[in-house]
Swiss-Prot record:
Family: Belongs to the ATPase delta chain family.
Assembly: F-type ATPases have 2 components, F(1) - the catalytic core - and F(0) - the membrane proton channel. F(1) has five subunits: alpha(3), beta(3), gamma(1), delta(1), epsilon(1). F(0) has three main subunits: a(1), b(2) and c(10-14). The alpha and beta chains form an alternating ring which encloses part of the gamma chain. F(1) is attached to F(0) by a central stalk formed by the gamma and epsilon chains, while a peripheral stalk is formed by the delta and b chains.
Function recorded in the entry: F(1)F(0) ATP synthase produces ATP from ADP in the presence of a proton or sodium gradient. F-type ATPases consist of two structural domains, F(1) containing the extramembraneous catalytic core and F(0) containing the membrane proton channel, linked together by a central stalk and a peripheral stalk. During catalysis, ATP synthesis in the catalytic domain of F(1) is coupled via a rotary mechanism of the central stalk subunits to proton translocation. This protein is part of the stalk that links CF(0) to CF(1). It either transmits conformational changes from CF(0) to CF(1) or is implicated in proton conduction.
Main location: membrane
UniProt membrane topology term: Peripheral membrane protein
Protein name from the UniProt record: ATP synthase subunit delta
GO MF entries: proton-transporting ATP synthase activity, rotational mechanism
Stretches of the chain forming a coiled coil according to its record: none
SUPFAM superfamilies tied to this protein: N-terminal domain of the delta subunit of the F1F0-ATP synthase, V-type ATPase subunit E-like
Keywords: ATP synthesis, Cell membrane, CF(1), Hydrogen ion transport, Ion transport, Membrane, Transport
InterPro entries to which the protein is assigned, alphabetical: ATP_synth_OSCP/delta_N_sf (IPR026015), ATPase_OSCP/d_CS (IPR020781), ATPase_OSCP/dsu (IPR000711)
Localization annotation: Cell membrane
GO cellular component: plasma membrane; proton-transporting ATP synthase complex
Length: 179
């Protein structure tokens, strides 16, 4: 529902990062802030607490992050607090990462297998996907025993499902239809 808004915030920050030649630094800083927020119950409680004023929340964030992140990132965080969007920072980070990939002619491919891919399999998959999408492929591998066997690949909205679990489900559906 708020993807468009997340994208706009991310694009604004990305443009500032580009102007300052600090895209990698900003991405790294945002990841660190997201991890700190996710792993700190106290920060989450403060951000969610209705009786703590916005100005107090901004003061707390300034105290925590002043010397840890770039001033422009801190300003971005304070705007998100003001607009009550700080709890959705991770979504903005994901959008910023997508923008980074787009601008660098790259695309993320999520791959699920039961066992890790061999080096040759990984290289072949990257090559084939690169040819199909005409972009540099960033492979994100995940081990998932529930697929039983085969490989599942998601690139953007495209899904290539060659898993044994899906084949078995399809066979089961066909058998139930015949009864």
């Amino acid at each position: 529902m708020y993807e468009y808004l997340d994208r706009r915030y991310a694009l604004a920050l990305y443009e500032v990062a580009e102007e300052n030649n600090k895209v990698d630094e900003y991405l790294r800083d945002l990841k660190e802030v997201v991890n700190i927020i996710k792993n700190s119950e106290d920060i989450c409680k403060i951000l969610k607490h209705p009786e703590i004023s916005t100005s107090r929340k901004k003061e707390i964030f300034t105290e925590i992050f002043k010397d840890k992140v770039d001033d422009k990132i801190l300003s971005f965080l304070l705007v998100l607090i003001e607009k009550e969007r700080i709890l959705y920072l991770e979504e903005k980070l994901k959008e910023m990462e997508k923008i980074y990939l787009e601008k660098n002619n790259m695309i993320l491919a999520n791959v699920k297998t039961v066992i890790p891919l061999l080096k040759e399999e990984r290289e072949e998959l990257i090559e084939k996907l690169g040819n199909k999408y005409n972009k540099k492929i960033i492979l994100e591998e995940e081990i998932d025993k529930s697929i039983i066997g085969g490989v599942y690949v998601r690139v953007g909205d495209d899904v290539l499902d060659g898993t044994l679990s899906t084949r078995l489900k399809d066979i089961k559906k066909m058998m139930l239809k015949r009864e």
